[in-house]
């Protein structure tokens, strides 16, 4: 495998291709011989990963590192070749020899090395725009949160496919929205997450391959292929109508990885309905017999490729390598694509369980997904795996060939969910809830009027296109308000504004407000509980459900919040109202399958925030805690087969689950590690305990917190947060902890009988400056609750938060979570946590 980016960029941050493209046979043989020397010298049994730096001008090389284990690139190598490295490594560890290991799905032994008659490309997925102030430069530290793998017959095809797959609104190497680069040479020589698009811009502006090479040090072989794509976009631009484009030109465009969307953009340059024009391109293509072919990936270098079901779609072929016939007993499941902030392994769990249930019921299951990190892209998980795009165009290509009973869009998160109504318009049978109902739930206006019609309360909101309208609306509902711009200039896409100054600053700096780009302003309820309702319904009747609550008050994104199931601290009446509203919505939308509703509750006042007619991030968690597979039930319903109704409720179980979030702020230099309405966590854990303290403590330790040994620093923000933390601070004092606090917090604690040592703010420059003390590791836990959004408060608070992260000191920025954590470790010691397997928790 070869990194597209030069040495200096972490391999996890680099585009990677396989097999190597820019090395000749002699250079490749040299590196292979070196590898054999290394593994024989170390005595490797099993898997090994060696990274080289290689200068092809001088044949000079360096071994960078050797990992005598399965690595991140091992998973990529397995998916790239179809050779199951982990399976073979496990057998070798058990004492088998290579020639004794039969490769899964073929009669061949693992002794045969895989050979590739195709190319693959891995591209990282970054979500840096989620973090205010973060450096976008990429280098030796890994910041990407996911990756994709594309397969094809040419580099041009795989890079264009791959750039569509990363799911950031890009359509390939060319034909994207116009990106602004202040200094293009700077962008090319100091790489950021957008460098590949800076190269596209450079070609547009007439840069030569040599000039780009001198700035980027990316091998000219790759740059030449990218130039081919740019040059062919100019060929397409010469035509005014798609009907005028010769079939040979269309065929070559498709071979170079151009999507129908890109072709429509270059030929027709439509201002209006680009989807309509893309479908026109599709129709003309099909009429001219410019069609894709489906190829197999041979899972070893065997004589029996017909035994494998690992497929990809390409335009560089003349016939399909698999047979096709209409099969009413087949079902297509759309996967979740690249891991990103907001969509991760939870949806892969849902996809895999849907596929397994379909297979159990005798259906031929067909999976479309392109994430090499997932279980759903293991070729033995489904009857057919299309390792390919989840674009509208590609899904239609597969459905045209497979002609299944239908397609499941509700288990892979938002990507497949967004395709539901478009597939419906093409007369594709979508299994489960009707796409028209999905559209009613997804469309803010339709959903809001449905809630009004059903008499269900919701926070007041309005879509506004003038600043005057924004201020009028805020005058009616009062501060704080949640602002969602439709066009974001910089920073987070959503923000809570607590006063007129903040509102004005946010809208001026972060968003455009106009008729074309309206802004949605919602009433924001302070100190309200956020509650999740995960459920499965059949023809509008709720079959099973789970009610879980957030530890944090509303204002922390549900993906970052600490989730407790079953809910421990909500009124019985609140739970009753939530069930009633859930049933009403399920009936009105005639839901058949999974769905999730998010509620706000204050006292017994319950409001609906949103409803998703698909599996949510919390489905695997509640399924595992409750020991009932919600996705299996949902899949059975979608396939019109019998299912088991639960005979117990959420509150019959004698244990508690807590889901805690994992953050990666230490890798994101300069990012402010404070939680808000935009999600920033990159992972999660779920833990079970006999009571809330045990479950919370286990989950917090699992995401990297440690129980403080001696000293805790508290900077508790506004009065409400001070009150929320008071009992917890008393517990710290009673348990012998040293408490340090900033001025206002120290004074408040002293007034209420808690002794704390006062530390000065970062900008005060005194000897007891909190930043000096953080640098000296004087604290075992830092609690910093943002007080308000004034410049001094933000700057001082930011320095404390960032200091804690940079010095690897556990940090909590939410008063309710801090309070719960302190109570948990004061009530229970780490040695008292029981070690129990999941199977030991029994109903």
What are these regions (language model features)?
Residues 1-257, 276, 292-293, 302, ...:
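ATP-dependent carboxylate activation and anion-phosphoryl transfer catalytic cores
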Residues 253-256, 262-269:
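Extended, domain-scale alpha-helical bundle/helix-rich regions
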Residues 215, 225-226, 266, 280-284:
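Residues in the recognition helix of alpha-helical DNA-binding motifs
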């Amino acid at each position: 495998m070869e990194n597209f980016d030069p040495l200096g960029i972490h391999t996890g941050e680099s585009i990677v291709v396989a097999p190597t493209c820019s090395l000749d046979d002699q250079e490749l043989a040299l590196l292979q011989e070196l590898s054999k020397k290394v593994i024989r010298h170390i005595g490797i049994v099993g898997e090994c990963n060696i990274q080289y730096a290689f200068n092809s001008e001088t044949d000079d090389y360096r071994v960078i590192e050797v990992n005598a284990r399965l690595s991140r690139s091992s998973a990529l190598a397995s998916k790239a070749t179809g050779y199951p490295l982990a399976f073979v490594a496990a057998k070798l560890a058990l004492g088998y020899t290579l020639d004794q290991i039969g490769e899964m799905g073929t009669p061949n032994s693992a002794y045969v090395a895989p050979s590739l008659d195709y190319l693959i490309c891995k591209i990282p997925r970054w979500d840096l725009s989620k973090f205010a102030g973060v450096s976008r430069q990429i280098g030796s530290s890994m910041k990407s949160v996911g990756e994709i793998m594309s397969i094809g017959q040419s580099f041009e095809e795989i890079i264009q496919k791959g750039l569509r797959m990363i799911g950031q609104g890009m359509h390939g190497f060319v034909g994207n929205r116009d990106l602004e680069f202040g200094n293009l040479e700077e962008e090319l020589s100091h790489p950021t997450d957008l460098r590949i698009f800076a190269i596209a811009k450079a070609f547009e502006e007439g840069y030569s391959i040599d000039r780009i090479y001198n700035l980027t040090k990316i091998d000219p072989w790759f740059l030449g292929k990218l130039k081919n794509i740019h040059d062919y976009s100019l060929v397409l631009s010469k035509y005014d109508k798609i009907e005028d484009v010769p079939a040979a030109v269309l065929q070559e465009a498709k071979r170079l990885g151009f999507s129908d969307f890109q072709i429509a953009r270059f030929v027709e340059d439509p201002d209006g309905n680009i989807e309509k024009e893309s479908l026109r391109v599709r129709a003309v293509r099909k009429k001219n017999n410019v069609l894709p072919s489906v190829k197999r990936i041979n899972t070893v270098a065997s004589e029996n490729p017909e035994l494998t079901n690992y497929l990809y779609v390409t335009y560089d072929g003349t016939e399909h390598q698999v047979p096709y016939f209409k099969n009413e007993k087949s079902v297509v499941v759309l996967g979740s694509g690249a891991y990103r902030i907001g969509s991760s392994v939870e949806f892969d769990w849902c996809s895999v369980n849907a596929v397994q249930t379909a297979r159990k019921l005798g259906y031929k299951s067909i999976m479309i997904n392109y994430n090499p990190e997932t279980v759903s892209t293991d070729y033995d998980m489904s009857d057919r795996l299309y390792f390919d795009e989840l674009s509208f165009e590609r899904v239609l290509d597969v459905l045209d060939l497979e002609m299944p009973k239908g397609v499941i869009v509700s288990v892979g998160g938002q990507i497949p969910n967004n395709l539901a109504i478009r597939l419906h318009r093409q007369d594709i049978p979508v299994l489960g809830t009707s796409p028209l109902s999905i559209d009613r739930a997804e469309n803010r206006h339709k959903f809001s009027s449905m809630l009004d019609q059903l008499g269900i309360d919701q926070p007041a909101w309005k879509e506004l296109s003038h600043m005057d309208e924004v201020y009028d609306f805020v005058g009616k509902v009062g501060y704080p308000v949640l602002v969602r711009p439709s066009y974001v200039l910089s920073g987070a896409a959503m923000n809570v504004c607590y006063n007129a100054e903040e509102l004005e600053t946010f809208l001026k700096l972060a968003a455009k407000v106009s008729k074309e780009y309206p802004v949605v302003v919602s009433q924001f309820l302070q100190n309200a509980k956020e509650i999740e309702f995960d459920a499965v319904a059949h023809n509008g009747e709720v079959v099973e459900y789970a009610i879980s609550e957030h530890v944090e008050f509303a204002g922390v994104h549900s993906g970052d919040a600490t989730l407790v199931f079953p809910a421990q601290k909500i009124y019985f009446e609140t739970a009753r109202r939530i069930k009633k509203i859930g049933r009403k919505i399920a009936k009105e939308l005639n839901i058949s399958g999974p769905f999730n509703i998010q509620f706000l509750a204050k006292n017994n006042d319950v409001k609906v925030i949103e409803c998703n007619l698909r599996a949510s991030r919390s489905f695997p968690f509640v399924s595992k805690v409750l020991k009932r597979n919600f996705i299996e039930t949902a899949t059975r319903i979608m396939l019109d087969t019998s299912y088991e109704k639960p005979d117990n409720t959420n509150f019959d179980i004698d244990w508690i689950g807590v889901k805690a979030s994992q953050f990666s702020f230490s890798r994101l230099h300069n990012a402010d590690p404070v939680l808000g309405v935009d999600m920033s966590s990159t992972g999660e854990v779920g833990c079970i305990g006999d009571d809330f303290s045990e479950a919370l403590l286990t989950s917090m330790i699992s995401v990297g917190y440690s129980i403080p040994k001696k000293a805790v620093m508290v900077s508790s923000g506004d009065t409400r947060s001070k009150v929320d933390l008071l009992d917890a601070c008393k517990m710290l004092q009673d348990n012998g902890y040293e408490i340090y606090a900033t001025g206002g917090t120290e004074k408040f604690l002293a007034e209420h009988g808690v002794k704390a040592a006062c530390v000065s703010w970062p900008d005060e420059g005194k000897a007891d400056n909190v930043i000096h003390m953080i640098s000296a590791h004087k604290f075992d836990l830092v609690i910093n609750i943002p007080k308000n959004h004034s410049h001094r408060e933000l700057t001082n608070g930011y320095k404390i938060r960032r200091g804690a992260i940079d010095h690897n000191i556990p940090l909590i920025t939410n008063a309710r979570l801090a309070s719960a954590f302190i109570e948990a470790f004061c009530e229970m010691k780490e040695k008292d946590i029981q070690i129990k397997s999941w199977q030991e928790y029994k109903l």
